[in-house]
Amino acid sequence: MMVSSPPQLEINLETDAEFVARHIGITPSDLPKMLSLLGYGSLKELINAVIPPEIRLQRPLALSEGLSETAALQKLRTLAQQNQVWRSYIGMGYYNCITPSVIQRNILENPGWYTQYTPYQAEIAQGRLEALLNFQTLVSDLTGLAIANASLLDEATAAAEAMTLSFNACRQRGANRFLVAQDCHPQTLAVLRTRALPLGIQIVPIDPIAGELPWENAFGLLLQYPASDGAVRSPQALIAAAHERGLLVTVATDLLALTLLRPPGELGADIAVGSSQRFGVPLGYGGPHAAFFATREDFKRQLPGRLVGVSHDALGQRALRLALQTREQHIRREKATSNICTAQVLLAVVASMYAVYHGPDGLRQIAERIHQRTVRLAAGLEAAGYQLYYSEFFDTLRIGLGNLPVPVLKERAAAARINLRYFDDGSAGISLDETTTEKDVADLLALFGARPAEVEGGDRLPAALKRQSPYLQHPVFQDYHSEHALLRYIHRLQAKDLSLTTSMIPLGSCTMKLNATAEMLPISWPEFNQLHPFAPQEQAQGYQALFRELAAMLAEITGFDAISLQPNAGSQGEYAGLLVIRQYHHSRGESQRNVCLIPTSAHGTNPASAVMAGMQVVAVNCDAQGNIDVADLAAKAETYGDRLAALMITYPSTHGVFETGICQICDIIHRYGGQVYMDGANMNAQVGLCRPGDFGADVCHLNLHKTFCIPHGGGGPGVGPIGVKAHLAPFLPTTQVIPQGSETGPVTAAPWGSASILPISWMYITLMGGVGLTRATAIAILNANYIAKRLEPYYPVLYKGAHGLVAHECILDLRPLKKSAGIEVEDIAKRLMDYGFHAPTVSWPVPGTLMIEPTESETKAELDRFCEAMIAIRSEIAEIEAGVSDRQQNPLKNAPHPALMLATEPWPYPYSREVAAYPAPWLREYKFWPAVARIDNAYGDRHLVCTCSMPLTN
């Protein structure tokens, strides 16, 4: 009997699309040399050996041919022109603002800032760490609370994180009710309801000015200050009453208002949350924007997200790094305080620079100007006989319309291309902002048949709530108010950071590929970045068309039937996908299904997300080859049987291989009634070659900031849409704009998440076309195998798949070097900085290893440079092993070597300055200098300082 051979990949990998050769770094002349090293005659032959035959896609992706950059931009411009940019005074936490041109051009549109990765390697990230420390100082000063994080995803998510922190802090009491003021932003309340349900928390809306509140069994209270509808009232008595009963109090607030109003910390709040969007970040139809989270010192170890702290380096210099990392999900896993990793660093940097540029006086002047125009608007309305709901306010009015019918007001507003907020009781809301002019005030009054009136008195702020305490006194907020000064400050910080403009960033599981300029240009178009997220949908027809087209493209690429673009980070995609699974089981009367199987190799966000979704995490073992232990999986699936909710699996695996048993694994889970959740972090190895929806996954999140070219921004923004099979489609997260009948609530504040960066992924797919995307995947796999092959004589490759090949990344085992030379993986990571490279992923998923992902965008010359650096470092280690170099005083243990270190006299090390700083010939042409020597992380955690307590840059 003849055994049929597995089907061979017949997909076309050749394309004439102009952009593909720009995106892919490997040239036609490079290809034969690289394949020859691997022992293959063609790219197809290599891919057939890597991809398991049972999952290979046997047809081309049904996507259009790739367009030229000019044609793609013209096509996108046609969509953008379908959006209508009206004057929006809707408020609800979203405001028009002015992005200073010096910040727009030199940060938001600058690849030196937006192509950086999360600052794990702090010695080559001092610039963005300083900008984030400025952000933390800004938030801490304005909120009056001791400690603030380096950004969260949006205001509603920050409020949900505050709820969770409060719940965990009061867990011993057994309380499960969270009181929420009914004048909070409605989108915040919606996200809170979503997050509360799986945790068994009951959301109780309350009237903050009512007499007695339902305190019984409550653990926390959320207040909005100023209120969503504009009221400014003191929360102090309510906070004190809550504290008497053991509740923690969160205040959602507005940073600009806090330049004039007493800060929440002074009023007794335990936590303050909000958005920094109006500090120079465009509306963007809802995002991305940097939220903030500030709290008392007591809760520093429960703080969600990332935290920048001050320490010192080996030379005694002040240096910055990420603090208290042991509390984060990648270490704490299911015990983590939050699942958030990527947040909104780029937007936090923009907001911090806005504050640096304007300084405390400039910010106060902006706030006073907005308030005075709101006062004049109020006076005109009152003179015309309209009743204001509140006599004290900052920038927002709620107006009783009297005899003016709402339809008439809407008609007048539409004729003037103005958006207002309309309440269910027939009143209207107007929120003014930095861009509002006197003419705008007159136009608004005209809608009501009113005219500007004389203003008696000064402001309309409560006397007891006027801010007296100083803020932003640090020199960084005083010294850079001219454009030249700020430009040089921005450039000085940028020069301290290694980005993709410097060299390859070979971080495994991070996919640091090209973020092409043509893909990035549209984020600055006003048709995309000046729409309010709650503007009527007919004003956003271009966006809606883009959403439909992008969702259809992603559905074709993944094999799923429906896509939600709402999740604004990979972590939120995971959470949303698990909520979909939970809701599906509940709809079938199987609410007991709450067990989530997760391999021990999984990224820490997986178990953290599962716990947030109300699931019990059960670990599944991996075998010696790094694959899921199928026998252990089957046994646990059987054990939990009708309690099995889901399996979370990454594919290719976090160990960098295509597991051949993936179909069997999915079948086992389905046999016991569970659903398969696939983490799409490694989708860059699948596009065009296989589709998760075809081989058994029921739901999958994608990282558009990895596979689909949204830049990492130094730690955000990210986008994590989810794809689902048809049976799960009814349970996708709903939005407030288009109710879908789903019982799964929204997971983000804005209906479409980080809408304004979705054009980046649309552009990437449109430029590449189906064949171009498939070729990119094949080249990414080729590059990873090329590096593995070149480095294997020097460092063992820990895991391999069929035919001795890896997927799109490889893991080098450095553990033997600790015994032979006393060298840790950190030493190699720091020494790579001296060679001009960012380290690969350190000690994950296996401690003592490096995981390398080169992507398809790097040239062969850059791959070779990286390999030569790694080989040279191995030679340095060999000298230690041979006793030629000292085990402590050697170039690795002392790395990195900043310029200041080289100026040391007398030179104290047993190797030359040249070996320290110029260990490779290419460094003589261009040398990237680490800003500081090796940082003492432990000191920084023991002596936690997370604000600008003294000058950082002179």
From Swiss-Prot:
Q: Which CDD domains match?
A: GDC-P
Single Gene Ontology MF annotation: glycine binding
UniProt cofactor(s): pyridoxal 5'-phosphate
Keyword Oxidoreductase among record annotations: yes
UniProt lists the family membership as follows: Belongs to the GcvP family.
Quaternary structure note: The glycine cleavage system is composed of four proteins: P, T, L and H.
User: Main role?
Assistant: The glycine cleavage system catalyzes the degradation of glycine. The P protein binds the alpha-amino group of glycine through its pyridoxal phosphate cofactor; CO(2) is released and the remaining methylamine moiety is then transferred to the lipoamide cofactor of the H protein.
- In Swiss-Prot or TrEMBL terms, this protein is called Glycine dehydrogenase (decarboxylating)
Say which species the protein is native to: Thermosynechococcus vestitus (strain NIES-2133 / IAM M-273 / BP-1)
Gene symbol?
gcvP
